[in-house]
């Protein structure tokens, strides 16, 4: 049996192994979790005890991290533990962590129908390529990185679809203790995120006259060979909301607004899930489908009618 190593030493070997299988952006996220959360507490330990992990969890929650963020940190910790045990670098350890009951569920923030119409009308009357990106997001539910990565070649006027082929993001690179950021273009979040989305009539009206004049290799938001990055575009979007006197809403709220309007229009959940590029339908159901009392009553009434 090899000599037991510290969590820090195992993490280095684990990262090297992971490098072969995951995207650079995922590896970067793992590195940040290690540097900011795991290694400062567990780096010098040669064994993980359930009590230590439970205490760590509660401390992170008290620091203001959400349960989802803490769970993501624990997933990385568990992967390192499994890797270490498999290669006889750490002792076998099973631990289960309990989370306090959440008092209230986070409600997704979306645009009101009036404000959504206001933005879409403004874009039609005040065309810029950056404004077009907001309209595209409200019409397709694309993520900000996907919008930034959209090229004119991804827009097909014959099939009237947009192909989501790439995403742009700025990632942290940690190299020998030194940190720097890098803007990267990569494939979208998951295999399901590579998708084709139909364009509605209004979006086609905006895009059709432009598409024929544009260089296919150019990015839509800049109409240049160089893209804009999500942070810059997010700042522009915030200014747009301010200008239109619309309450502050995260850019992701545009995607949520699109999905919510689809569900409100009684689109079937599987189709909405595919359009959004979710890994599975349960993500869509958990995020957007929340039947109210009236819906529940109708469901039960419908069931009893079928018995007659």
Predicted regions and their residues:
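Conserved tyrosine-mediated DNA breakage-rejoining catalytic core shared by Y-recombinases
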Residues: 150-209
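Proline-centered turn/helix-capping motifs that create local helix->coil transitions or kinks
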Residues: 84-94, 166-174, 209-215
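Hydrophobic recognition helices of helix-based DNA-binding modules
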Residues: 37-42, 77-85, 207-211, 262, ...
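N-terminal core-binding DNA-recognition domain of tyrosine site-specific recombinases/integrases
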Residues: 3, 8, 15-83, 89, ...
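Short functional hotspots where side chains directly engage DNA or cofactors
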Residues: 159-164, 220, 261, 273-291, ...
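Basic, Lys/Arg- and aromatic-enriched nucleic-acid-binding interface segment
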Residues: 71, 86, 90-91, 96-144, ...
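DNA/chromatin major-groove-contacting recognition/catalytic segments
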Residues: 56, 122, 174-177, 286, ...
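Short, basic (Lys/Arg/His-rich) helix/loop patches that form interaction surfaces
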Residues: 121-130, 140, 197, 212-219, ...
